[in-house]
Amino acid sequence: MTIQNNDRLVYEAMPTRPLVTWPEGRTVAVWHAPNVEHYDYIAPGGGTPQGRTRYPDPQHYMHRDNGNRTAFWRMLRAVDRFEIPSTVSLSLSVLEEMPEVRDAMAERGWEIMSHGISNLRPLYDMPYDDEDRFYELSQQLAETYYGGRRIKGMLGPKVSGTDNTSDLMVKHGMTYHADWIHDEQPRPLRTEGDGRLVSIPYSFMLNDVPLLLAKHYPGSYFVDMAKAQIDRMLRDADEDGQGRVACIATHPFVSGQPYMQRYLEEIFAYLRSDDRIWVATAADITDHYLENSYDEQLAHANGISAAREARA
C-alpha cells in the first residue's frame, strides 16, 4: 500500500535515534510561548474564522483585544516573578500598533517568533511571491520596531502554511518552525539547498485556548496536565537518555484573566523547582540542537531514508 508522505521529514522511532542532550546535564527543555495576537476587526477575505459568523463581531474581537489591553500586564507579572524567558508567538502588527506591549517585551529581552501579521490572515494557498513578501515584511517589522533583531522562527498565523513555507523561511534567515508538533525533540526539516531548518515542539495539548476556552476545563486542570506531562518526560529521559522538549502555550486573553493568575504562577513555580528542567527560549533550544545534534541526526535520518528507498 502506498500513501502520500511528507517529504520534509523522515520517520525515525525515538529508541533508534542518536541521543539529544541539553546543557548542564538537564534532560527536559521547556519553553513558554505566550501568543500575543492581533485580529482584524473586519476579517479580510470574508469567511468565518475563530467562530465569528458576522461582521463586525464585538464579542469575539473584544475578548481577544482584552488580552493586549489588560490581561497581558497581569501575565507579565507572573513571568517576571519567576524569571521565565519567553518566546512570543507574535502577530507582528502589534510591534507598530501597540508600542507599550512591544516595549515591555523588549525590556525583558523576550524573543519574538512570527505568528503572522494578523491572526485572521493565514498563509493557506498563498502564491509563492506573496509568501516571499510576507517573510520580507516580517523581518522588516522586527528590525524596525524591535531593536534591529531578526526573527528566527515562526508559528504560522492560525498554524497555516504552504508547500513553499519551509524553503522560504530558510531564505529569510529562520531556523525553526513550530507548526510541526509531531515529536518531543527538535527534528531536521528537509529544505532546498543546504539550508538548516528544524521543527521545534509546540503544543496543542498544554495550551490554554483548547483546554480552558474551548473545553472549559478549570485552571487547576491546566496545572495538573503541565506537571504530569513534564514529570513523565523527566522520567522517560532518565530511562533512555533522550533529552525532550515541552512547550507551555498561553494567550493573555485566557491565562491573563484574574482567576488564572494563581494557576499560571503554580506552573512557573513548578518549572523552577527541578534542576533537570532547562527553561529556555525556542531559539536557545534550536541553537543548541543545531550545534550539538543536528548533523548527526540528519545523517541518521538520511541513512534511514536511503535504506527504505533501496528496499522499495
Outline where the language-model segments fall.
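Catalytic alpha-helical scaffold of carbohydrate-active enzymes acting on polysaccharides/glycoconjugates
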Residues: T2-V198, V223-I248, V254-A312
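A conserved mid-domain beta-alpha-beta active-site/ligand-binding segment of alpha/beta enzyme cores
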Residues: P201-L234
